[in-house]
Amino acid sequence: MTNPPQAGSSRRTALKRIAATAAAAATAPLIGTVDPARAADAAAQQIGAAAWETLIDGNSFASRAALESEWNYLYPWGSDHNGTARMYASSTDNNHCYLSPAGVLNLKATRITWNEGNSSKDPYLPIHYHSAAVHAKNQVLVSDRYPNWEIRGEFQAPSARGTWPAFWITGANSWPPESDILEYKGDNRNWFNTYDGAWENTLVAVSSPGSWHEYRIWMTKTSGTDVQIHYYLDGAWKGAHTGSNFVGKTMNIIINLQMEGASGSSGPAGDTYYKARNVYVGRTNNG
């Protein structure tokens, strides 16, 4: 894993280290014909003298106060989405969104036994679960000023049929864009997805999704309209997608535990847990 610049580190060295990750990934299929070190130098020069800044430092789940300073409860648009879980969480309702131990966010889905109607969002499925979601107060915007972004976190994700955890970014004012950093849909395959009007998918079988794994993207501006997104699992590069027309589009960062829907019906009768820690967001700032 490439670490972000730390206090007291050389800005040039730190930026070169970050850039090397994307450069090495971009040249991975060409190893033997392209010098990765030279490619890393070129990528570092493209980043240039930009300053690296941290938006979420990895400690936002250390306490309830820290959580609420960096995250909002529910989806950006409310409690419902495209599955059968309705999100319930607030500063006074911690049944489905809580910290235990300190530093670990727990989202819990519980099956309900009463009729709560249907989701207000397409495809309007009947509500079978209460669960939780959070979205970051900081938003993602790729631009000339902010051309490079790193988003990562460690997760213990459920993967049983009917469970649908996600860690993703999506358009705040329009859809697309979307990038799914973590998404399990009822089995042990993580879906690294990019949506820009058409879907690009990289599916990776994960050994024990319920154990801690790190999921990460490096997103960089490649033109006046497009980005390239590199996807990583546990520090290993898994693929690169093009996000057309991502530039200039404000995006929300979301962690949620949805249920059923695309992950299959007849979900778990018992409680389902999705855990997160060390979530980090940083970017270059050209001033």
Which residues fall in each region the model found?
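N-terminal secretory signal peptides
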Residues: 1-13, 20-38
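Low-complexity, Ser/Thr/Pro/Gly-rich disordered linker/stalk regions
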Residues: 17, 41-149, 181-186, 257, ...
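Short tryptophan-centered beta-strand motifs in secreted/extracellular beta-sheet-rich domains
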Residues: 61, 212-221, 229-231
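Aromatic sugar-binding interfaces of carbohydrate-active proteins
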Residues: 70-73, 225-275, 284
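Solvent-exposed strand-to-loop "edge" motifs in beta-rich extracellular domains
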Residues: 112, 154-160, 170, 220
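Beta-strand acidic-aromatic groove motif in beta-rich domains, primarily in extracellular
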Residues: 161-169, 226-227
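Glycan-recognition/cleft segments
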Residues: 167-192
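Short, aromatic/His-centered strand-loop micro-motif at the edge of beta-sheets
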Residues: 195-212
